[in-house]
Structure formats: structure tokens, C-alpha cells
Amino acid sequence: MERIKRFLKSFLLFELLKGMKVTGRYLFAPKVTVHYPEEKTPQSPRFRGLHALRRYPNGEERCIACKLCEAVCPALAITIESEQRDDGTRRTTRYDIDLIKCIFCGFCEEACPVDAIVETRVLEYHGEVRGDLTYTKEMLLAVGDRYEEQIAKDRAADAPYR
């Protein structure tokens, strides 16, 4: 009896029919394709894109040169140099992020005690040569200034989960 069952399964191509059933189900299902440049999918407030350095409302940069982000970066993509000010506080003289090395894990953002470094929703950036994707302090501050309103909204939406 078992031999007959096995023969019928192989003769009727039972596995092939099961596969065709799955194919047919997805063939007539609604499509989920997004035509990227014209259409964009919604992004989460927690999206980790291009980095930015933030400023306080009075215009002073937030980074206190504690170097926690540099220490926690698993890809060693962050380079920080700092100096002591006359009033005894430390400030960065150099803050570079190599986006080629960066794995966008968000550890730098979590480690920062003053929310100076954040990851924005900016997904589209490019460079023509390798050095174009090393963002300096000035470039990161410019990104932060440009997207501060969106960053503040995302931080407020994420606040209950922090």
C-alpha cells in the first residue's frame, strides 16, 4: 500500500502542484513594489541615516568632547580631537565620521550624554571619490542645522521609548 501511495505522489507530481499553488497565490496578490525615486516608503522616527551634530538653541554646539561615541564605535569610524577652553570646558577641534567605515548601528547616538550626535532620516547622499564620504565637524553641524526641526520631532516621538 505504501508503495502505491509513493508511486501516485511521484506520478502526479504532488510537490510540483504544491509549488504551483504558492506561485499562483502570489501571482494574483496585490503588488508591493515601490518605484523608488518617484515614490518613497514611509520612514520610522528611529531611522538611522546620515549623521548630524546638533547645537543648543543659543547656537553653541552640544558636543562636550567626552569621546564616548568614538570609544563605542565598533567600526572605528569616528575621530575626535579636543582642546581645553579658557573656562575649563573641553570642546572638539576635529570631529570626523568616515561614512565608508560606518555601519549605522546607532551606538554613538545612544552613548552621547548630551544628544550631540544624532542620525537623521537622510538616506540619499553620495560621493564621487572616497574622501567625499568623510564628514568633518563643519559638515556635520551644517547637516544638523539644516534638519534640526525634523530631528527635534523625531526625538520627541521617540522620547517615550528612551
UniProtKB/Swiss-Prot annotation:
Keywords: 4Fe-4S, Cell inner membrane, Cell membrane, Iron, Iron-sulfur, Membrane, Metal-binding, NAD, Quinone, Repeat, Translocase, Ubiquinone. Its cofactor is [4Fe-4S] cluster. Residues 53-83, 93-122 form the 4Fe-4S ferredoxin-type domain. Binds 2 [4Fe-4S] clusters per subunit. Its EC number is 7.1.1.-. It is a peripheral membrane protein. GO terms for molecular function: 4 iron, 4 sulfur cluster binding; iron ion binding; NADH:ubiquinone reductase (non-electrogenic) activity; quinone binding. Its main location: membrane. It catalyses: a quinone + NADH + 5 H(+)(in) = a quinol + NAD(+) + 4 H(+)(out). PROSITE patterns: 4FE4S_FER_1 (PS00198), 4FE4S_FER_2 (PS51379). Belongs to the complex I 23 kDa subunit family. NDH-1 is composed of 14 different subunits. Subunits NuoA, H, J, K, L, M, N constitute the membrane sector of the complex. NDH-1 shuttles electrons from NADH, via FMN and iron-sulfur (Fe-S) centers, to quinones in the respiratory chain. The immediate electron acceptor for the enzyme in this species is believed to be ubiquinone. Couples the redox reaction to proton translocation (for every two electrons transferred, four hydrogen ions are translocated across the cytoplasmic membrane), and thus conserves the redox energy in a proton gradient. This is NADH-quinone oxidoreductase subunit I. It comes from Nitrosomonas eutropha (strain DSM 101675 / C91 / Nm57).
